[in-house]
Design a protein with these regions (language model features):
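Short, conserved clusters of charged catalytic residues that mark active-site
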Residues: 3, 79, 112-116
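A cross-family acyltransferase "interaction/gating" segment
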Residues: 11, 58, 93, 107-171
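Catalytic core of membrane glycerolipid acyltransferases/transacylases, capturing the structured
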Residues: 13-74
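Residue-level preference for the first positions of well-ordered beta-strands
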Residues: 16-18, 93-97
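A short, well-structured juxtamembrane/interface segment
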Residues: 1-16
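Short, flexible loop segments at the rims of nucleotide/cofactor-binding pockets, characterized by
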Residues: 1, 70-75, 106-108
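Helix-adjacent hinge/juxtasegments
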Residues: 68-82, 88-89
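Short glycine-/polar-rich loops that comprise or flank the Walker A/P-loop
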Residues: 42-43, 65, 90, 124-128
Length: 172
């Protein structure tokens, strides 16, 4: 598929930041990774469902690329945020789908997000940028695994302005 970036100039060339993106299909991480790695030469670290790390080949790739497994229940819930915190302190990019799963809305409206991305930004002082993406649902159905005809359709990835957290940073 063809990624069409809009607003990429808003992202810092150096230093850590957090990207928060909507999550429509299983192609979304590839679109964001393309945007940051190919366009900016920065490899993002995604927080990803732990089950993906158990899939042969895919799990090995995720681990080798420094992606962060998220355990959805149990005592290890703070482990992903600690790992993300360490990457941010080292100047890396973290990408998070704050909904924690694929959007369930048939109209693809975002669901309520979790607070981890903002907590990371407040704890580390790094900027947060919203990412809106659309078009991947024309290539891969929302919960599907079979590509639709026209694989080379565009996937639009829009980078928004930095989220202003100054009022919240003052409270800390």
């Amino acid at each position: 598929f063809k990624v069409v970036p809009v607003g990429i100039e808003k992202l810092p060339k150096k230093g850590a930041y957090v990207l928060v993106a909507n999550h429509v299909t299983n192609l979304d991480a590839l679109a964001v990774a393309y945007l940051t790695y190919v366009q900016l030469k920065r490899a993002p670290h995604f927080l990803a469902k732990e089950g993906l790390f158990r899939v042969p080949v895919i799990g090995a790739i995720l681990r080798a690329a420094g992606q962060i497994p998220v355990y959805r229940s149990g005592h290890r819930n703070d482990t992903p945020l600690k790992a993300a915190h360490a990457y941010l302190e080292a100047g890396h990019t973290i990408a998070i789908f704050p909904e924690g799963t694929l959007t369930r809305s048939p109209e693809l409206w975002p669901m309520r997000g979790k607070s981890g991305a903002i907590r990371l930004a407040l704890e580390t002082g790094v900027p947060v940028y919203p990412v809106g993406q659309w078009g991947s649902e024309q290539i891969l159905p929302q919960y599907g695994s079979k590509f639709r005809p026209g694989f080379w359709k565009p996937v639009n990835v829009l980078i928004g302005d930095e989220i202003d957290l100054s009022n919240y940073r003052k409270r800390q």
